Amino acid sequence: MPTSIRTLTASVVIGACLAAAAGTRGADVVVAEGEFFQPQGKGWAVTPMDDSYGSHSYGGMWLTQGGCLGAAADTKDEVAVQKVTIPAAGAYRVWSKYQAPPYFNYLHRIEVLQNGKKVFEHVYGKKGTDRLWSFTGESDELWWFWGVDHDAAEAPKTAVQLAAGPAEIRLITVANPAPAGKRFIDFVVLTTEPADTYEGFKPYGTASPFTLEALAQSRVFVRFKNNSPAAAKLKLTTPVGHFQPNYAGRTTEIPEAGPVPPGQWSPWVNIGPFCRLVHDEGIVVSLPGAAGPIESEAARDAAGTDRAGAVGLPNGETFVVPLDIAWNKPRKIFTSQARAEELTRLAKTGWRTRNGGRKPQSILYYGLFYDLDRPWVAALKDALGYNTLLPAPYAHAAVDGSNHGHCHNPEELKRYVAGLSDAQKKAFKVMSFGDEISLGEINWADPAMQAKFTGWLKARGVTAAALGGVAPDAAKLADRGTNRRVGWYAQTFNEEERFGFYRDLTAQTRALIGPQAVTGANYSPHGMPMYYGPIHQWIDIFKHNGMSMYWAEDYVFSVPMPPQTISWMLATVRCGVKYNKQKIHFYVMPHAPGQRADFLRRSMIYAPGAGVNHVDNFWVGPPERHTENFVAWGYTDTYRVLHESIYDTAEAEPLLTGATVRPGRVAVLLSKATDHNERLLQIPKAQDVLMAGCKNAPATIQQIIGRVEAQMLYLALLHGQHRVDLVTEDDIAADNILAKYDVLHVAGEWIDHRVPAKLEAWVKNGGVLYASGGLGLFNEFNEADPALLKVLGLASAETKKNLAVIRPVMELPVAPAIGEIAFEGGKIPAVGLKQALVPTDAKVLGTWSDGKPAVTVRELGKGKAFAVGTLAGCAYMRTGLPVQPFPRGGNLCPVTPTTFDPAAARLARLGVDARPVEEPAVCDN
């Protein structure tokens, strides 16, 4: 058990709250699990983890024993009761451990009674209250850039004096002011520890407050029959851990009292503390000299009267303890082999299997299964339909070898290839250069790099004027932080140097392995803004042929983004590979708990249709062999989706092989100028109205609202039944791509200085330009530049902002409006950014509440140029999202919005409505 500031566990009571003997050190602790409270009416209910705000196989959201006590956001005066035993008289602090995604209230009252008298009461869950959180210590609201790990523990500083003996804990719902969230109470803790601390609090040895205290007294009893010829103990091993950061496997032997005689049953032994029941626990059994299967039984009580299943399994095999077995009576222990064989049978006889049972032939399906030497593991992988990395005699692609272990440089590549046989080289397909990596940087202080930079500037024809008056010979890499023009070109030089590194590494891979090998590096989409990576890394490297395969991932269920973000992600991928037609390798993550089966099905089917050549499910099973990414055995629907999606795609494969995604006539700009400058722009958190209320938020943060606006515009157009492409400023300025499009959408406060003139000529020729979320007031060097304003028919735009960060599912539902736009008879709340427009020859279409222009259009030649002085895409999405806390995984994950304010939808789609684009197909909702 990890160390802490002070060891708390001396005596703990859980479940039925049987008293435990007081320890000789530390504090006295009582843990009252939420699922063991008795609701006195209909307001409270025992709630499974999947129906709470946190259901995951990793991170910092954990419900001990897979459940909690839940109540709707609007309930009041509902009561639930649990009887406990106080082990020793003392002053106890009363903690509530509950789920608290930021920005919402979760009000509930705890009362403690002894001898029929109320001795304690306190209201918990008020927004802005100081609490202890996963990973971060104390804060009022929790702020993490990737979203949130939202387990909170809260207690008043004042302790209550309790006598040894019986007590009653009462949970009561109270009036819950807006914005109000559902109350999910994991457990209540009473402890004589006076400090704000818990087991593993520092240095963050656990990912959830007080969870180790609760796990230490879990109650799951097992016994076994010794079928060996000698007295023996049963060895129990967990192959790995799942509860972050406790990933190491563990071993124990039972019973502790001594070996069991041959032919006899052991006494009942509580293995609950050995298990970590925030997840299913797989346990490998070993009994020296066992004659046949080892018989084991489980129960919920020490007497073995409340049975919870029985198994017989060979030495070295695994039985599974479901995480909710302590309270969910239908749950029983089971063997991994039996469960795998059941899923295999369902795949072969019960689930839809299209294409006559023939696997895909050209689209590769990857998914890691450990222990393929076990016949039942290989049989399951084959039955699900995977066509890579299977042992004989199962059908799989002839060229499917992969290195997911990564070769980051030539030396690692050579060492890896040296270990391959000729046959393995011939069958090798996918080489990884890294997981969730950046492309790295040059050695900025290297004199050789300075000389190379000077030559690069001259070769590109960069003039002193372009460098702000600095001659190319005098432009120094060391000045990149003080001269924004030199900095822009220095960064571009750095990028191209790194492209060359990976281009060479790709060539070496092909030379060492063979021409069939493709190279890539998985890009994590979880940095800010999520699913909008640096343009040079996500687009330009593929234009420069730095890698021969695009590799990306789908963890949308784990972050506060709308589900259709996967469409944006793959549009980004296609933007990157359109130059050189690289293969696309895409992680579609099935991990359960976490990913909903219906979302997974959409992603599994959508990905091949969006151009993906390799669908990779990362880690699948057996779940007890993986740390934090897997499909738990109980998620039958997830396994079914994997099987049916693979075979559904196999039937459509003849239409997909060699095909490309039909291009659209509508585009959204991926602006490198905005991307570069927003990443450099550090906003004090006090200027972000929501971040300002989060103590643990960083003092400054990069602005992301321009890039998020591009994403939300994309989704608004997608909802309008349009095929939408993503294009770059280089596409416009250097490749003259505008002729392929009827409508272009631009978002952000920066735009490449080469682009406005191209846009003006295109609009005059009939194109429709739509600009929002900043109107390109600055060029890529962060200099005020009126060129785009002139195209829009504006003299200026007075800009105000109250948000730096928008993670749509988290901030948009609660963000205070920065203004209101009157538009076509409707009133549209604006979020994040407000620009009062000053037209020259543009017509006003919408106004702010003070009458100043907010929306304009300029007729220019045969085309039109629209300007919207706010984040129109974000305003649109805000009207469709439910006002609810962000649920990380599980059944409460937000569905794709389908109902939006008509005026907000019209505002977001002014451009495409001005020039109707004929689409070959439409979809219903």
Segment roles from a protein language model:
Residues 9-19:
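Bacterial N-terminal signal peptides
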Residues 373-423, 497, 501-512:
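Aromatic-lined substrate-binding rim segments of carbohydrate-active enzymes
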Residues 310-316, 324, 432, 441, ...:
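Hydrophobic targeting/anchoring helices
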Residues 315-380:
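N-terminal carbohydrate-binding accessory modules
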Residues 339, 416-568, 572, 732:
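Polysaccharide-binding and catalytic clefts of secreted carbohydrate-active enzymes
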Residues 354-401, 426-429, 545-550, 603-614, ...:
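Catalytic domains of carbohydrate-active enzymes, especially glycoside hydrolases
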Residues 26-315, 327-329, 335-338:
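Extracytoplasmic
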Residues 747-925:
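A conserved amphipathic helix/loop scaffold
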